[in-house]
UniProtKB/Swiss-Prot annotation:
Pfam families: Ribosomal_S6e. Keywords: Ribonucleoprotein, Ribosomal protein. This is Small ribosomal subunit protein eS6. It comes from the Archaea.
């Protein structure tokens, strides 16, 4: 059974809510890709739609939108998720995970895409990233 640490970003308020999702709710994310819309009920936001924006595995390797599948792959990067160059033109071969969510993913980042009728703070609790 898959278990994810999910960080839900609310672009309207600028707050982030973080909690663990497992079981049937976690299975709603399996097989989806970065950019895919998922029913917000999977993260406790009934009536909302959330978009998968990224994630990482248990070793901290980031998911990349431009790498197909869910496997690990060594890619030559010039920047972006997984590598921040110090000089212009610097490139580096880095191991990253593909854009498809699998059981190997430990953390998922999602953003609220469509808001429902009830406020987010009421559904998820008022304690966001200000702890």
């Amino acid at each position: 059974m898959a278990t994810f640490q999910v960080a839900v970003a609310d672009p309207e308020s600028g707050r982030t809510y973080q909690f663990e999702v497992d079981g049937q709710d976690a299975n709603r994310f399996i097989g989806r890709e970065i950019g895919a819309a998922v029913d917000g009920g999977a993260v406790g936001l009934d009536g909302y739609t959330v978009e998968i924006t990224g994630g990482s595995d248990d070793a901290g390797r980031p998911m990349r939108e431009d790498v197909d599948g869910s496997d690990l792959m060594e890619v030559l990067l010039e920047g972006g998720a997984g590598f921040n160059p110090d000089e212009d033109g610097e490139r580096k071969r880095v191991t990253v995970r593909g854009k498809e969510v699998s059981e190997a993913v430990a953390q998922l980042n999602v953003a609220i895409d469509e808001h429902g009728e009830e406020p987010v703070a009421e559904l998820l609790g008022a304690d966001g990233d200000d702890e």
